[in-house]
Amino acid sequence: VILAGDMFDGERVKIRTIDEILDAVRRTPNVDYLYLAGNHDDTAYAFADHDIPTNLKLFSKEWATYEYDGVAISGIEICEANAHSLYLNIPHKNGVVNIVTLHGQVGSSSDVDEINLSLLKNKGINYLALGHIHTYSEQPLDSEGIYCYSGCLEGRGFDECGPKGFVLLTVESGHLEHEFVPFSCRQLHRIPVDISGLTKNSEIGQKMKAAAQGIPSEDMVEFLLSGGVDPTANLAVSYLQNLVKRDFFLVKVKDQTHLAINPEDYKHDISLKGEFIRLVLDSDASEEDKAAIIRTGMQALMGEEITL
């Protein structure tokens, strides 16, 4: 099992977490775990003062290679000291499938968090196992190999949407095949919903439900409301969230709308509404706050229940 970094979120890791990981490794003594630390974790710190099982192999800031039947797996932790020099002596074993694991963002320069992809081409790498990006992706490296981010096993926020899982590598007769295997028990989805012109929460709710059709009920959904909204519209995020919260495991609703309002329409309006809107538009409040203030004020002027 190749773990290409970021198993932890930081250097400070609870002892209980470390113990559970090491216990899991010990329960499968016939499986080797090859762990390369990422930019969010520190192997030396995390496993300090712990007895490391023999089947947990830790990469360091120097190249190391672990050989198996027909496969050689090499890796190195990128740091300031080796960010440029590591490309000069990339390990390669003749007659076997060569896998290299690194952690960082692929790019065109050599840095602590950036992997210089061009310097890895034509080095006999059949598969470049990468960590850092939490979404699965794969691209050709050169004529002989590919590079691949396996992503994470479970999405941890709405910035990590889509299928999550691991990559299964199969090596037979000197040939490597790879397959993405979905693993997460649920997915996260960000659903944009343009509510321009809608003034009623019931209409907005119907459009949200239509936009989320086909998403399994066990998944998590974040609705992003956008578009221009009339100042008299009674947009109540809490109401909308309650309207759809039973449809999915978790629901969030974000108001990213803007006021569909033309200041010229209220320039000569002598009503209380006109005076109120002019005062708010001329204030130093942010556009987001102006929209919220005007919406709340309109509710108050019309004698409606104020929703915040």
Locate each region found by the language model.
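Divalent metal-dependent hydrolysis catalytic cores, especially in the metallo-beta-lactamase
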Residues: 2-6, 12-13, 34, 221-222, ...
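Accessory, non-catalytic peripheral segments of nucleic-acid enzymes
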Residues: 173-308
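His/Asp/Glu-rich metal-coordinating catalytic cores
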Residues: 9-148, 152-157, 161-165, 170
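N-terminal active-site segment of His-dependent metallophosphoesterases
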Residues: 1-20, 94, 290-308
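Short active-site-proximal "capping" loops at secondary-structure junctions
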Residues: 7-9, 41, 228, 258
